[in-house]
Amino acid sequence: MEDQRDLRARLESSLAEGQRLREEVQQLKAILDQHSIPLPQLRTPQSPGERCLPAPSDISQVGTLSDNQAKITLFRSLFRGREDVYAERWRTKDGTWAYRPAGQKDWLAVLASSPSERRKVDRQTRTLYTVTDDVIRQHLAGKKTIGIYPLLLDETCWLLAADFDKKTWQEDSLAFLATCKGARVPAYLERSRSGNGGHVWIFFEAPIPAVLARKMGCALLTQTMERRHHLGLDSYDRFFPNQDTLPKGGFGNLIALPLQWMSRQNGNSLFVDDDLHQYPDQWQFVALNPASWGRSSGMARQ
């Protein structure tokens, strides 16, 4: 009985304290309004183990002349997927290029298995590499080409990317980009590494369910087709993430990251404007204000 009275007393005290804090917040807001001071943007707390985004002031100051670490920090705050695994581009035995999860093969386990089981055993025993600053540094320097798996373990995502990769990719991606702007959804067009396609990137202020992100993408795509009847959007290929839920035993689809140095030398893997001209300072262009991502998150949740 004593415990119940004590619990009730603490509950009443907490409720009173909460009311006092709410009144104090309202008073502070009134003072800010009186002096025309905007309410500071609060960042969403991250889940345990997740990296924090750099402060908006830090992001907005990054440009071509910034040091490499500042660029890497900015890059990782934008192009975020799973950090316990990433994909790397490699040349197969027949000379073609493909992507695979980066990791160390367990040769003893692979060679001990039958030839028909070796690929399966490799997937099961491979030690996967995690995303690090050095991995991003090598990508940006052109020493390797990496991709991310945007679908997180809890089936949320930090971003949505629309892939256009056929003959009409330019007009189709620009039409989609215009729809995003009309909906006040910040979106950014990258010419893909091949130069024959484009990715329209949309970022969120915090991870949102992939199903909501993809529904938002579909709504924007539908609006684009309704607004531009003469465009069939034949070049549209898919969204990343490409699944609402994580496939059993897999990572979901990967997307190659932009700004890879070797591709940039050919005018590809770069962000372009409405005339498909690359921005002079790529880093300044992607130095986005995280507060603007809230509009993307808000629309996705509608």
Segments from the language model and where they lie:
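Short, glycine/acidic-rich hinge or "gate" loops at secondary-structure transitions
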Residues: 36-39, 190-195, 228-238
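Short acidic (Asp/Glu) and glycine-rich catalytic loops that position anionic groups and cofactors
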Residues: 51-54, 196, 265, 279-281
